[in-house]
Amino acid sequence: MNAPALSPARRTKKLPPLRVGIGGPVGSGKTTLLEMLCKAMRERYDLVAITNDIYTKEDQRLLTVAGALPEERIMGVETGGCPHTAIREDASINLEAVDRMLSRFPDADIVFIESGGDNLAATFSPELSDLTIYVIDVAGGEKIPRKGGPGITKSDLLVINKTDLAPLVGANLDVMASDTKKMRGERPYVMTNLKALDGVADVVAFIEKKGLLTV
């Protein structure tokens, strides 16, 4: 995990851009995670980001205001319908957005794609995403991991966010961790408090390792 990262130029010549899909229910912390990842990785990698909302471009605006990346490197997509359709059954609107961003920034190392808020059944099309990160939050209760669904059981990385709220909602983090291991087997997970940056480095390390960004 501590190996030096490839420079953007070296990776661009060797491999196509890594596409990282970030999904999860409304309010779980997807946009916050994307913001923190951009801020943590933008000095080492050439990044672009695509956000999905049903009728607005609110997440694009939030990332721009937060200074996650320069405005021109963040594209908002209005899906106009069910969020999971735009990332799975008919991902054409997002595939087109990826192509447009890469035509503007052909040296990009990573394309982040944030889905609109959806249920536990949402997954990314393999045509759209090389790695998938699924975000749930403690505020939903400690039962969430054992509810299952493809996002929890099949994502490359599960992020359990808002650990600081556990005492307030009566959630037992040890129970959540145990249930997560039962549901995911050997697939990794990270517990985070993104507002305090807790766990962000672990997510970055996962992306670098699984995305072949380290040597």
UniProtKB/Swiss-Prot annotation:
InterPro entries: CobW/HypB/UreG_nucleotide-bd, P-loop_NTPase, UreG. Keywords: Chaperone, Cytoplasm, GTP-binding, Nickel insertion, Nucleotide-binding. It comes from the Bacteria. The keyword Chaperone applies. GO terms for cellular component: cytoplasm. One of its GO terms (molecular function) is nickel cation binding. CDD domains: UreG. One of its GO terms (biological process) is urea catabolic process. It holds the Pfam family cobW. Facilitates the functional incorporation of the urease nickel metallocenter. This process requires GTP hydrolysis, probably effectuated by UreG. This is Urease accessory protein UreG. The gene is ureG.
